[in-house]
């Protein structure tokens, strides 16, 4: 009798272990699908322009500076690849030199929201923080590739929070050039490197 109850316990244990393994496998599958959804952004390209895949790893770049644009309710984190950060630390463009080819800027934009219900913040003294991701924009310096736009190529990718996907905004690598003409004296870069 004892051996029969032992067999039942072994069978029950094996059965429960199998269920646990299936649950883990399903969880891993969901994680892989989540990663694939995130990685899908690297297949997006501005027609006749920059591809998101050209900027792999931008999420880990150092911060150039942050900015807030109240008129359009956006918070921005401006990031730079190592070449951009090193050039900025050397004083470019303030020293009159242009950024070197290979410099890349990523601008991550979020809608902003006010925190008013967590101490020490209140309606009278709110904290402004990122809310929904709005877009990711890029500028890349390559004089040979972009001679008609002062050496800079531009790309903007709008984020759809509902579907979790990006889509290109505009066409061609010159889509941001007209706007950046206002920053010509700073090699067409609006946001200066913030000293630390």
Label the predicted regions.
Residues 71-86, 166-172:
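Short, charge- and proline-biased low-complexity linear segments
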Residues 8-10, 32, 38:
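Short hydrophobic transmembrane-like helices used for membrane targeting/insertion
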Residues 22-28:
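Signal peptide cleavage region of secreted peptide precursors
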Residues 28-30, 34-36, 44-66, 96-196:
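Sequence context surrounding c-type heme c attachment/ligation sites in exported
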Residues 1-12:
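Bacterial N-terminal signal peptides that target proteins for export
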Residues 76-95, 119-124:
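N-terminal post-signal-peptidase region of extra-cytosolic proteins
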Residues 10-20:
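Bacterial N-terminal signal peptides
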């Amino acid at each position: 009798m004892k051996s029969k109850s032992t067999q039942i316990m072994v069978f029950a244990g094996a059965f429960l272990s199998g269920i646990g393994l299936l649950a883990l496998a399903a969880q891993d599958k969901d994680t892989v699908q989540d990663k694939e959804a995130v990685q899908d952004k690297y297949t997006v390209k501005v027609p006749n322009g920059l591809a998101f895949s050209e900027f792999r790893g931008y999420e880990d770049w150092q911060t150039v500076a942050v900015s807030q644009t109240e008129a359009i309710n956006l918070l921005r984190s401006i990031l730079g690849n190592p070449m951009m950060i090193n050039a900025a630390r050397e004083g470019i463009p303030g020293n009159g030199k242009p950024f070197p080819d290979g410099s890349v800027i990523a601008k991550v934009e979020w809608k902003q929201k006010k925190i008013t219900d967590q101490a020490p913040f209140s309606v009278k003294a709110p904290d402004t923080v990122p809310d929904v991701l709005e877009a990711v924009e890029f500028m890349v310096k390559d004089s040979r590739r972009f001679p008609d736009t002062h050496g800079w190529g531009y790309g903007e990718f709008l984020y759809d929070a509902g579907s979790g996907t990006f889509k290109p905004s505009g066409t061609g690598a010159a889509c941001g050039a007209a706007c950046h003409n206002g920053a010509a004296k700073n090699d067409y870069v609006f946001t200066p490197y913030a000293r630390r």
